Amino acid sequence: MIAETIEVLPIAEVSPLLAAGGTGPFSDAELAYARDKSDPERRLAARLAAKRAAVHLLGPGVTEADIEVTRVPGRAPGLRLSARAQAALEKAGAGAALVSLTHGREHAAAAVLLVRAPA
């Protein structure tokens, strides 16, 4: 492992993004996934926490919009990186970014780990 961080944020932080009708830093796929659930704010808050954690690890020049949290049924969530974010990952000497998400009633959190590329 190269680096790790955890981001925690209030779920209420996401509500204004949904009310305004904007997409914020979320991809169409992230919005569609969340809106298909009974608790879209919680789902999006966990994704926003993951994006912020990844940006923190990948450094300047990478934005929340450069990170997409992916979800395949039956598998752990993943991160899809833009070309800019992928370049930052490689510059850090990492081969992958791993993510874990959680949410409760009031807060959501994500842990992101940068792991070395296989030798």
Regions found by a protein language model. Give the residues of each.
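Core catalytic alpha/beta fold that binds nucleotide/phospho-ligands
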Residues: M1-A119
